[in-house]
Amino acid sequence: MGDYNMNEFAYGNLYDDDDGDVGGSSKEGNNSIQKVSMLPLVFLIFYEVSGGPFGAEGSVNAAGPLLALLGFVIFPFIWCIPEALITAEMSTMFPINGGFVVWVSSALGTFWGFQVGWMKWLCGVIDNALYPVLFLDYLKSAVPALATGLPRVASILILTLLLTYLNYRGLTIVGWTAVFMGVFSMLPFAVMSLVSIPQLEPSRWLVMDLGNVNWNLYLNTLLWNLNYWDSVSTLAGEVANPKKTLPKALCYGVIFVALSNFLPLLSGTGAIPLDRELWTDGYLAEVAKAIGGGWLQLWVQAAAATSNMGMFLAEMSSDSFQLLGMAELGILPEIFAQRSRYGTPLLGILFSASGVLLLSGLSFQEIIAAENLLYCGGMILEFIAFVRLRKKHPAASRPYKIPVGTVGSILICVPPIVLICLVIVLSTIKVALVSFVMVVIGFLMKPCLNHMDGKKWVKFSVCSDLAEFQKENLDCEESLLR
């Protein structure tokens, strides 16, 4: 679009210096913006993916203790590890903002790059619409006025604006805020796991009733608590030494996320008598009370509220930098590439915040189901792009590479694709129709943007750093972006 011909964009060595910074990750005047280091990045990944066991209660409600625990053991191998490995390889191959949009555009063209960007951005905004609502749900028992009416609406608005302002102030601030929030949110579950040991009855973990399993709720709960590993790729250009930092951070993130979901469920289902109907969102606070008393319940409630804020911050960062990356690549209008004096994508933040406010009235379960379906559609495009780039450009530089060949790269994608098919088959008609409409809107938006570009109604251009990189590498044998 505009000045940007992706057929001419040549891939070479994207690292400009020893720190692995990318030309195009920062515009002139923002080069002094501090990059995100390892520890904040791990906690950003943690909050982009899960944020802890809050919401995992539905797995026990849907399938009982045994299948819930097995799900959080097996699911990481089927979904988390393959997605994290692919994200690590692709993010070091293309360490620039935009992440998966760049991968798909490279392999399948900008039309499909825009579609994956649209679906994933919409998923992020839908996801973020949940967090202010859930935050208030955890507090309404202490402050009943927050349950309904004007006080609730005003609280959602104020909370959204405050968290949006934190995103505006810079990714480093968001990262370190995520660290402190993550430590505070997970400490009560570490305490609960220790306190529960004398009360554990292992036989409670083995309860299973295959004839009474809500598979749709079960799979959607697992997927919602363990997906979004690719989100960190959208801000790869903001990471210090991404070719080393990103793979390690993703590895630590997988371990952290898996344990943060499994251990609380292990202690909760093993320490108290089972009543599946009670295992709904927020029930872990009651479990904490039964195990440790009222003080632990209050701590878990405070941790849940804090975790929702952390997930909001991390998700908005990912969504806004995705829009910035798409603009720097010439897929969105140039105005989306503008940064604030703190190096943050101003318009991307405003668009994401507006979407959150518009969607905050939807029901929890419908949001999860619709979001998961859209997310699965985007993941299929990412898996296809990963395999295609492996096949068509095997010699391209990959600072981190999964140690498998073309056949191995296909096999890595098989388990998550099977899971995606299950989610699609089990989805309700209502959710499928809503998701289909959203996809159709994306299909219509791209030609409209092309028309606007042709009429010069809005300006599209590649970031100056990327344009310079393009010019210097036109003769490179490995031309990827098309």
Swiss-Prot record:
Q: How does it sit in the membrane?
A: Multi-pass membrane protein
Q: Which Pfam families match?
A: AA_permease_2 (PF13520)
Cystine crosslinks: none
Segments traversing the membrane: 36-56, 66-86, 94-114, 143-163, 171-191, 254-274, 294-314, 344-364, 367-387, 406-426, 429-449
The subcellular location is:
Cell membrane
Q: What is a GO molecular function of this protein?
A: polyamine transmembrane transporter activity
Q: Name one GO biological process term.
A: polyamine transport
Kindly give the InterPro entries that the UniProt entry links to this protein. AA/rel_permease1, RMV1-like
Q: What UniProt keywords apply to this chain's record, in alphabetical order?
A: Cell membrane, Membrane, Symport, Transmembrane, Transmembrane helix, Transport
Q: Which GO terms describe its cellular component?
A: plasma membrane
Supply the PANTHER family for this chain.
POLYAMINE TRANSPORTER, POLYAMINE TRANSPORTER PUT1
What's this chain's function?
A: Probable cell membrane polyamine/proton symporter involved in the polyamine uptake in cells.
**Into which family does the record put it?**
Belongs to the amino acid-polyamine-organocation (APC) superfamily. Polyamine:cation symporter (PHS) (TC 2.A.3.12) family.
Q: What is this protein called?
A: Probable polyamine transporter At1g31820
Q: Which organism is it from?
A: Arabidopsis thaliana (Mouse-ear cress)
